[in-house]
């Protein structure tokens, strides 16, 4: 489908063209939602995970991130002049020459498990900002001057009061809500009692494989980490 074939969606604002491998993707911002157009439906980015393949979902996510970034970088943060696109993923201020690139907010997420004579269990928590009543994993944003490993240990300590050991990298995932990168880890319980950070968490505790609460959707790295642990017990 070409941009020219979508003229019936106008008015729109053309933002940029992405070149990813052999793909050329046009990023546009519609002036108003599409309604009652045969064969087309407006769908939120999160819902597209169940519709698109992984490759196309990542393309859509990158497009959404750039739309957000374009909206928030229309003016130079140094001199206040309007910015102009320099490449397909960067801008430049024509007055002071400052170059602007998308900033990614890095966050960690960690699966903590412990082994007891009764078997294996996983630490799951419910954050107050969750929109649904599921339990996820300890997570938090990387702070200036921190390593990823230091961030994991700090977030676990602040949110749960626990000590961990055997910290291992698991995987990472772009998280375009609006411009994040989730870096996943696994760790073993090393000591302490669970004391939840009440400002951020409403519930939390240890769960076994046969006593699991609702967990996040498959689109998230949290679910990948949890499913990996569940599969180890099969």
Residue ranges of each PLM-predicted region?
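Active-site proximal loops enriched in glycine and acidic residues that flank catalytic Cys/His/Asp
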Residues: 126-127, 139, 168-173, 189, ...
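N-terminal strand-loop-strand
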Residues: 87-136, 141, 163-164, 187-189
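Short acidic-hydrophobic surface loop/beta-edge motif
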Residues: 16-21, 91-93, 110-112, 174-175
């Amino acid at each position: 489908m070409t941009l020219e074939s979508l003229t019936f969606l106008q008015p729109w604002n053309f933002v940029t063209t992405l070149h990813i491998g052999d793909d050329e993707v046009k990023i546009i911002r519609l002036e108003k939602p599409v309604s009652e157009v045969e064969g087309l439906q407006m769908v939120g980015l999160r819902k597209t995970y169940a519709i698109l393949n992984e490759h196309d979902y990542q393309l859509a996510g990158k497009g959404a991130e750039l739309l957000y970034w374009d909206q928030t970088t229309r003016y130079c943060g140094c001199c206040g002049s309007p910015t102009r696109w320099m490449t397909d993923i960067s801008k430049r201020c024509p007055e002071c020459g400052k170059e602007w690139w998308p900033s990614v907010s890095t966050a960690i997420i960690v699966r903590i498990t412990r082994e007891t004579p009764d078997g294996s269990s996983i630490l799951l928590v419910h954050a107050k900002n969750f929109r649904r009543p599921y339990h996820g994993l300890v997570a938090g944003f990387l702070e200036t001057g921190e390593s990823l490993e230091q961030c994991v240990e700090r977030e676990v300590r602040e949110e749960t009061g626990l000590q961990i050991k055997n910290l291992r990298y698991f995987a990472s995932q772009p998280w375009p809500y609006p411009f994040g990168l989730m870096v996943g880890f696994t760790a073993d319980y090393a000591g302490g009692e669970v004391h939840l950070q009440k400002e951020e968490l409403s519930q939390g505790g240890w769960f076994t494989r046969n006593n699991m609460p609702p967990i996040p959707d498959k689109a998230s790295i949290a679910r990948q980490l949890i499913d990996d642990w569940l599969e180890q017990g099969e």
